[in-house]
Amino acid sequence: MLKKTIRDVDIAGKRVFVRVDFNVPFNERGEVADDTRIRAVLPTIEYLLTGGAAVILASHLGRPKGKRDDRFSLRPVADRLSALTARQVRFAAEAVGPETEAASRELAPGDILLLENIRFYPEEEQNDPEFASRLAALADLYVNDAFGTAHRAHASTAGIAAHLPAVAGLLLERELDILGRLLSVPERPFVALIGGAKISDKIGVLERLIEKADYLLVGGGMANTFLAAQGHNLQASLVEADRLETARYLLAKAGPGERITLPIDLVVAPDREQPEKRATVAVESIPAGWAAFDLGSGTVRLYANRLRPARTIFWNGPVGLFEVPGFDRGTLDLARVIAAAEATTVVGGGDTVAAVKQAGVLDQVTHVSTGGGASLKLLEGRELPGVAVLQNR
């Protein structure tokens, strides 16, 4: 780890501004429905509190578009965090302003203050220097523990570091270490499973994985585009017609052999609303007007045989329309294969994590990345703005 972390600085008696990712779902009663992201940052919070710091937490929630919207208030998160930490968590109804500044000055070691949704302010996503300065005025030290937003140059992820000493939290440190090792010194065989709808979303990471992985297994809608680039008729399946040349370029870059491994059969149906009519067919035998919605059983076996001997596995993106019963088998079966592998297993992306949970194997993977877009940018070799601004060791 080339960046300083909270272990490298004096925290006793300090007010510490921690950027976290509490972008969590609520249930119909307005309570936190899934506290995974809150639990992920607890080690950082506990380390700071035990070390004699007062903690000021800032996060976004949803997309309020730069204005107050009570549907996206973080107040319910304060209640959940209080339960998880067994401490009173104070809540500031404004992220900045005289009342919040007064509340921050009154904090004693061991106190926690959660600010209201940072994206209620348009200046946040604009990385406004004045807004960043007002956030910095609340604290003595800045900590980024929000890997999921580290690829964004916002006031609370980048701009604030111009005004305070800036270091990484324990969650961010773990993400950078694990994902960094994934590409620098992976134990081999290294197998990557990449799904999702579009090649265009993942061109950079596909290029990098072709160079680094022993096998790159492709699923989801993007597999259709690769198959179409090889000349297969995918009928009504999702295909990015404007990315066929990109797919051919990636296949050529991989060279002969099966470094890029594509489906040999697919689960097809007349449309997504009729899974009961599904059939498994070879990729060259899709009925006219039908579309692919999942990997076929032969492909699942092929991919499982690539994954089982692996010593390092990275998975991003479901391989089918797993949220629809009948089109979920490929994703869930491969989730269980990955979880059972004697390998370092890293999964990332919101849909992928949801699939692993649905398969009941979340606790069996080595690392669940808290950042979808951020993990892909890092694996591409791109510098993350929220990491670049942190102090070097």
Curated annotation (Swiss-Prot):
Entry binding sites for substrate: 21-23, 37, 60-63, 119, 152
Give one Pfam family, short name only: PGK
The pathway noted for it is: Carbohydrate degradation; glycolysis; pyruvate from D-glyceraldehyde 3-phosphate: step 2/5
Family indicated by similarity? Belongs to the phosphoglycerate kinase family.
Gene Ontology CC annotations of this record: cytosol
Assign the protein's first listed, main location to one coarse class.
cytoplasm
Q: Which GO terms describe its biological process?
A: gluconeogenesis; glycolytic process
Q: Which UniProt keywords apply?
A: ATP-binding, Cytoplasm, Glycolysis, Kinase, Nucleotide-binding, Transferase
Q: Where does ATP bind?
A: 202, 323, 349-352
Which species does this protein come from? Desulforudis audaxviator (strain MP104C)
Q: Where in the cell is it found?
A: Cytoplasm
The first-level EC class reads transferase
Q: Which cysteines are joined by disulfide bonds?
A: none
Q: What is the protein's name according to its record?
A: Phosphoglycerate kinase
What GO annotations for molecular function exist for this entry? ADP binding; ATP binding; phosphoglycerate kinase activity
| Catalytic activity annotation | (2R)-3-phosphoglycerate + ATP = (2R)-3-phospho-glyceroyl phosphate + ADP
Write the Enzyme Commission number(s) for this entry.
2.7.2.3
Subunit description? Monomer.
Q: Which InterPro entries match?
A: Phosphoglycerate_kinase (IPR001576), Phosphoglycerate_kinase_CS (IPR015911), Phosphoglycerate_kinase_N (IPR015824), Phosphoglycerate_kinase_sf (IPR036043)
